[in-house]
Amino acid sequence: MFEFLRFYTFYLALLSGIIGLISMHKLPTNRAKFLVIIIWFAVVIEKVGYYFTEWTGLLNYYVFNFYMLITFSAYILLLRSLLSKVNHRLIAILCLMLFIISFFLNILYFKEDVNHSFTYSFAIGVILIMILACLYLVEIFNSDKILNFKRSVFFWYILGILVFHVPFLPFMMALNWFLIKHDESIFSLVVFILNVLAHSCYITGFLWSEKKYNY
């Protein structure tokens, strides 16, 4: 019934990407512009993933595992750049190393056929991003940035990452462990709703943020 919704996530990413481009004048640094690049990368991956099976006859796990490796690494590096305390930045580097190691361990686990969903790498990545996001929020709330944090595109971007991945993680793990029945209609509905929430945060950040808080 809702299977078609999953394919509309492409248009959500496209909308966010377009608004990001329109808002480039408010993104003064390479770090801020990097947010738009990540979104456009998602647009490309959504389209490639859609046609991958048609082109190759294979399931598109290859595409989305590659997407996970790049985007999660990018999220961790973004959070590292936003952290001001040296020990927190060191934790971010350790998180990046741990995630990359987990990803390649997943490849070794599926060495006979790596065209599977790397569920455990996804879970580890989400947990690491949650830890770093908490450190980022703690630093904000313990500094003068608390006065204008809603005007920062970075706050809204990190919030968007969290509102998608934190609820999706237990849902994905429940499917993987067969705690709930895999229903393509429900899966597509959940993915679509979480994408709406995430891209709403991204768009809010682009439109509501102010240039002076986006350095």
Regions found by a protein language model. Give the residues of each.
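Terminal, non-globular segments
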Residues: 1-215
